[in-house]
């Protein structure tokens, strides 16, 4: 089922998320719905808060980007209860957008590589290091689990420039090519 994507201004996007267990929800159905929603929205990542769930879960699919970003080859994963345990000292800057903030894209500075510990959809633990665009996608989605959106990471002057757009999104005065909830 295609779920509505919660827009900027929804309290769940700022709420702390909780760890999940195999018993805490119907994970198989939720993941199926999230993958379907992500595909229709044509995004490369979707976090549970973006569909109204304050839980520590996000999915990524960077496979469409692999031609330009080789590190995204076969980069389709589920991250449950993730924890970024290491960040590189080197930073990179890249323009980011977000399904919860349609029509806004801004340059965001992030660590160039990260190491993350997480559980997959079978609740098997992994510790992996990512760099480049794959690391950026993970950090963007991870921010949602921490109650942040990418505009929190832009310069104060740039935030002033997008303030009206953010206000309009929060009021539902925005067009998106996918189902939304304000």
Predicted region positions:
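Active-site rim/adjacent substrate-binding subdomains
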Residues: 1-139, 144-182
């Amino acid at each position: 089922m295609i779920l509505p994507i919660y827009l900027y201004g929804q309290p769940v996007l700022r709420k702390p998320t909780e760890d999940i267990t195999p018993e805490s929800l119907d994970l198989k159905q939720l993941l199926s719905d999230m993958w379907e929603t992500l595909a229709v929205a044509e995004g490369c990542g979707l976090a549970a808060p973006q569909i109204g769930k304050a839980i520590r879960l996000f999915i990524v699919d960077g496979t469409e980007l692999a031609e330009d970003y080789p590190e995204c080859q076969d980069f389709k994963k589920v991250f449950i209860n993730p924890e970024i345990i290491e960040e590189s000292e080197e930073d990179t800057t890249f323009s980011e957008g977000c399904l919860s903030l349609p029509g806004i894209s801004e340059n965001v500075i992030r660590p160039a590589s990260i190491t993350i510990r997480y559980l997959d959809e079978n609740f098997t633990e992994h510790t992996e290091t990512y760099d480049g665009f794959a690391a950026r996608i993970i950090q963007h989605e991870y921010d949602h689990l921490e109650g942040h959106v990418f505009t929190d990471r832009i310069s104060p002057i740039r935030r002033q420039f997008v303030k009206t757009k953010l206000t309009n999104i929060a009021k539902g005065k925005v067009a998106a090519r996918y189902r939304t909830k304000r």
